[in-house]
């Protein structure tokens, strides 16, 4: 990429799942960070990349209620995308509560890809199916 360029993409998370996940894996450092949350609260993941100069890059992952950062007027005008909501409305004088789980963990040698994250039996179970690696972490709460 040329210096001073950016890129922004969006992904609709699997509508068949109640709980979904986002992860970032650094295989060389063998570290993984991730989030698990309710798909009906955050159906979208936005990914943005910034290339401010030579040999420099910034990447962001954002689980969100909308596919792109647009004005409220544009979101209302455009409506749903792929039969999924593109906003959440908070009525006046009301509250909204959302929860998510976050994890940060070393991964075993040879763990190269996250295929799935499940919250089951009080544990987060993280799978790399191709390499037959599984990580189980204690979950602090349910969702």
Task: Enumerate the predicted regions with their spans.
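Terminal connector regions
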Residues: 106-143
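A contiguous, surface-exposed recognition patch within enzymatic or periplasmic domains that forms
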Residues: 1-95, 109-110
């Amino acid at each position: 990429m040329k210096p001073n360029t950016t890129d922004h993409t969006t992904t609709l998370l699997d509508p068949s799942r109640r709980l979904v996940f986002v992860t970032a894996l650094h295989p060389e450092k063998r570290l993984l960070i991730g989030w698990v949350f309710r798909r009906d609260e955050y159906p979208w993941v936005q990914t943005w990349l910034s290339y401010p100069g030579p040999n420099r890059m910034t990447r962001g992952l954002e689980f969100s209620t909308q596919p792109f950062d647009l004005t409220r007027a544009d979101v209302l005008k455009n409506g749903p995308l792929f039969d999924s909501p593109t906003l959440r409305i908070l009525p006046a004088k009301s509250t909204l509560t959302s929860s998510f789980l976050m994890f940060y963990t070393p991964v075993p040698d040879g763990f190269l890809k996250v295929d799935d994250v499940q919250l089951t039996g009080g544990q987060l179970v993280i799978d790399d199916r191709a390499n037959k690696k599984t990580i189980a972490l204690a979950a602090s709460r349910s969702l």
